[in-house]
Regions:
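Short alpha-helix boundary/capping and kink motifs at helix termini
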Residues: 17-24, 29-32, 38-48, 54-56, ...
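Basic- and aromatic-enriched surface patches that contact anionic nucleotides/nucleic acids
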Residues: 2-22, 169-238
């Protein structure tokens, strides 16, 4: 933040960054509203304000959080998180079974998949095909991520992390895809999709589990409790 854009970033390579100019370029039905939304999101990282993006609607779409499952952020599972002292995950770190990353977090996705006896299928989808499960999105966090996607070094570790696959539930009956973990990275890519206007659809890699979202949330919350993993709050102070 405050640094000049990287020369290889989309904003410096001629990419559209301010939203759609016409209905043909818009995600929904109101290009002017989309330009207003994206300007506000881009600005959040530079000021003292914050906005819950679940309270922001993109006309003609279910974005950002239309059809969400009404689950507060603090009640969502965190399969990548910090181990609580003395918990099972903490003990596995000390035993060398799990490794802490640079942020002091462990990735328990593989352990979770093994516990529920399911496979996570790698799929690449349009970001607009995914639905939010939680009912809170911290605007400042999405703004920070969007700033990196638009202005940061595409080959940096930060950008690579933002583009890592997220875990998604796919309902075997309806085909609906709901996000389990990775809401803020997804929302930043949605914002990028709005910002780039008619430059093409933004896609992301997902790990898809064929289980209805309610069942998968119950299973993953039980797992994170058992493992002793920190959950995250939607409180704007955090």
């Amino acid at each position: 933040i405050g640094a000049p854009p990287h020369p290889d970033s989309p904003s410096q390579k001629g990419g559209t960054t301010k939203g759609p100019k016409s209905k043909d370029d818009a995600l929904g039905t109101d290009p002017a509203r989309e330009r207003h939304i994206i300007a506000a999101v881009q600005d959040l990282v530079h000021n003292d304000k914050d906005v819950d993006l679940c309270k922001v609607s993109v006309p003609g779409t279910n974005l950002f959080c239309g059809d969400n499952k009404g689950i507060p952020r603090k009640e969502m599972p965190q399969l990548k998180s910090k181990p609580e002292p003395g918990g099972k995950a903490d003990q596995m770190v000390k035993a060398g079974v799990l490794k802490l990353d640079n942020e002091g977090e462990v990735n328990t996705e593989k352990l979770f998949m093994k516990q529920i006896g399911k496979e996570a299928k790698p799929v690449r989808v349009k970001v607009t095909e995914l639905k939010a499960t939680q009912n809170q999105l911290v605007g400042k966090k999405v703004s920070l991520f969007l700033n990196q996607l638009q202005n940061g070094d595409p080959d940096s570790e930060f950008t690579k992390k933002l583009n890592e696959p997220i875990i998604v539930s796919r309902d075997p009956e309806t085909g609906e895809r709901y996000i389990v973990d990775g809401h803020h990275r997804w929302a930043a890519l949605v914002a990028q999709d709005i910002a780039n206007g008619g430059d093409g659809d933004i896609e992301m890699d997902i790990k898809e589990i064929d289980t209805p979202i309610e069942e998968l949330i119950d299973q993953s919350n039980e797992f994170t409790k058992e493992m002793g993993l920190e959950t995250k709050s939607g409180d704007k102070k955090k």
